[in-house]
A protein has these predicted regions:
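Catalytic-face loop-and-helix region of soluble metabolic enzyme cores
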Residues: 208-274
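Glycine-rich phosphate-binding active-site loops on the catalytic face of alpha/beta enzymes
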Residues: 118-127, 175-191, 278-285
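Conserved, mostly hydrophobic/aromatic
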Residues: 18-19, 50, 112, 173, ...
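Short helix-capping segments at alpha-helix termini
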Residues: 87, 144-146, 202-209, 272-273, ...
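Glycine- and other small-residue-rich loops at beta-strand/loop junctions that grip anionic moieties
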Residues: 162, 184-185, 218, 254, ...
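C-terminal extensions of enzymes
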Residues: 255-306
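Aromatic-anchored, glycine/proline-accented short structural segments
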Residues: 169-222
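Active-site beta->alpha loop and helix N-cap motifs at the rims of alpha/beta catalytic domains
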Residues: 1-164, 245-249, 282-304
Length: 306
């Protein structure tokens, strides 16, 4: 069963691989080389789909110095059309709606083949950010322009830990047309389980079926990468930080932690009857970290009931 049918039927148990497009300064030839190598790496895994991120500068959200400088990347839709057009499974394209005018979004959505393209809309990173199109308007446009385009939303366990209402945001997004959710990178498994539990019982109380939640896992090859994850707003429990800091091999230790987190979430969702997917994120340009992400995806592929 392909990814679209799994999501529509709310069955879950699928595997995605998430990528950041090359830097904006990358030549067309180099971008094609990157795309070709990516396909070679992922082909043996049999992933059910790809995610392409839409990277935005989030310094307005966090005034602290960014551990790694912000470098603009290619538009994920352009990268897909020009360099990954032969990819064989569905692709989820992120759209940071604040960056695009309503006409931009209309034009893009109207040309999407809904059999092989899906979307996740992400709102502005802070109230101070200039907004070309709000998340709510973008959701409405999708209903008007291309209602068959499967739409996803973001799920943020950390926000649920702080405010306790993320499950209500998920239900509201579901009512606005979202067919699935994708989490931020999960390091705090308890925060993710709390969100899943509250969402599951809220759906039960309202008499609606939960939609798939895709949990994002990522490896971490250095303490500076860990610092960057925190800058992005991801909660990393101190015991995990201690494990990674004192490990003989930080990267290998992070793979073990990510796998354990994924397996715990799989078991929990199956028990609660919440459909789920797994996304392994690879955003590093370091070959060792990319290969570790592929290795993690391979391990998790064997644990899914696909």
């Amino acid at each position: 069963m392909d990814l679209r049918r799994r999501i529509v039927s709310r069955q879950g148990e699928f595997l995605l691989f998430a990528l950041t497009p090359p830097r904006l300064s990358t030549s067309s030839e180099q971008a094609q080389e990157i795309a070709d190598v990516t396909r070679e790496r992922l082909e043996p895994l049999g992933v059910d789909g790809l995610i392409l991120y839409d990277i935005d500068d989030e310094s307005d959200r966090n005034p602290d110095e960014r551990p790694f400088p912000f470098l603009p990347t290619m538009d994920p839709a352009d990268y897909l059309d020009r360099h990954l057009q032969a990819w064989p499974t569905p692709v989820v394209v992120y759209r940071a709606t604040a960056k695009y005018t309503e006409q931009d979004l209309r034009d893009w959505m109207s040309t999407q083949d809904t059999a092989g393209r899906m979307a996740v809309f992400v709102g502005a990173s802070s109230q101070e950010k200039p907004v070309a199109t709000t998340l709510r308007i973008a959701q409405r446009l999708r209903t008007e322009v291309n209602p068959d385009l499967l739409l996803g939303g973001v799920a943020i366990p950390e926000r649920h830990a702080r405010k306790g209402a993320e499950h209500l945001r998920l239900v509201a997004k579901q009512e606005a047309g979202c067919s699935y959710f994708v989490s931020q990178i999960v390091y705090d498994v308890n925060a993710a389980k709390n969100l899943v539990s509250d969402y599951a019982y809220e759906c039960r109380d309202r008499g609606i079926d939960p939609v798939p939640i895709v949990f994002t896992l990522s490896v971490c090859g250095s303490m500076k990468t860990l610092e960057f994850l925190r800058w992005l707003g991801i909660d990393v429990p101190r015991w995990i930080e201690n494990d990674l800091r004192h490990a003989n091999d930080t990267l290998d230790a992070s793979v073990e932690h990510a796998e354990a987190t994924a397996l715990e979430l799989m078991s929990f969702c199956r028990r609660l009857g919440v459909p789920f997917g797994i996304s392994v994120e690879s955003v590093s340009i370091r070959k060792l970290e990319i290969e570790a992400s592929v290795r993690l995806a391979g391990r998790l592929a064997n644990r899914l009931m696909r």
